[in-house]
């Protein structure tokens, strides 16, 4: 594959790979992935971590994960079916922005984690014009999702992710940010905008706002989001 052919590809797999590297650097013997979906992270750890568990609320995704031999149970982030300090590392991949009560989920993960919690979340470097435009478009899109009943918040900052931790906590907190700057095709951005508008019974106001965002996008371009890796580790 030529270098040019990768310039408009979503760098998401790169960020997920770096998350796995960070996780394996901690040499866990057991991992629980919360909101594991079909088990992509667990599958990538199969030959590297002795004990793997996943939790997800979606029975369809659970069945897909189980079909390839992964140990995944139905549950949610607020009541993990594990004893205190029974799992080395608890992970969240692009999950916090789908949770109505992240502090509660983090507290529950820290209860279960023997060594700590790792989080992979989206992140924008808003000092870059194409990133700022992308962040504004995403905020517009997520507002529509929320209006139609979905829990879909903006990507939380590292400060927001750790705000609920007591100031006197003995956790070691580390943050890494990653950005592979690749531009999105405008046709894809426009198509996704129209798809979001179709969810609304009266989309006129949202359409006007979208047009303003698209005008900015034609000036700056729209780049894929970066990612932040947050580690909350027991000292």
Where are these regions (language model features)?
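Short alpha-helix
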Residues: 152-169
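A short glycine-rich, Lys/Arg-flanked "PGG" loop and its adjoining helix->strand segment in the class I
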Residues: 103-117
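Conserved class I S-adenosyl-L-methionine
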Residues: 28-37, 118-143
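Conserved alpha-helix/loop element of class I SAM-dependent methyltransferases that forms part
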Residues: 10-29
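Conserved Class I S-adenosyl-L-methionine
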Residues: 158, 171-235
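Class I SAM-dependent methyltransferase SAM/SAH-binding core
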Residues: 38-79
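A conserved beta-strand element that flanks and buttresses the S-adenosyl-L-methionine
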Residues: 91
């Amino acid at each position: 594959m030529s270098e040019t052919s990768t310039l408009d590809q979503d760098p998401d797999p790169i960020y997920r790979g770096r998350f796995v590297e960070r996780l394996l650097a901690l040499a866990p013997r057991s991992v629980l992935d919360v909101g594991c979906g079909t088990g992509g992270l667990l599958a990538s750890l199969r030959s590297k971590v002795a004990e793997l568990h996943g939790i997800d609320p979606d029975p369809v995704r659970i069945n897909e994960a189980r079909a390839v031999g992964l140990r995944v149970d139905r549950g949610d982030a607020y009541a993990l079916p594990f004893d205190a300090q029974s799992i080395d590392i608890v992970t969240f991949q692009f999950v916090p922005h789908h949770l109505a009560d992240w502090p509660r989920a983090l507290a529950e993960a820290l209860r279960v984690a023997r060594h700590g919690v790792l989080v992979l979340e989206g992140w924008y470097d808003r000092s870059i014009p194409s990133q700022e435009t992308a962040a504004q478009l995403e905020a517009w899109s997520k507002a529509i999702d929320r209006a139609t009943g979905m829990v879909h918040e903006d990507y939380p900052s590292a400060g927001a992710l750790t705000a609920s931790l007591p100031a006197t906590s003995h956790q070691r907190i580390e943050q890494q940010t990653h950005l592979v700057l690749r531009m999105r095709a405008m046709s894809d951005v426009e198509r996704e905008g129209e798809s979001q508008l179709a969810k609304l019974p009266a989309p006129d106001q949202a359409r006007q706002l979208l047009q303003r965002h698209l005008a900015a996008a034609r000036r700056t371009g729209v780049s894929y989001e970066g990612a932040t890796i947050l580690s909350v580790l027991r000292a």
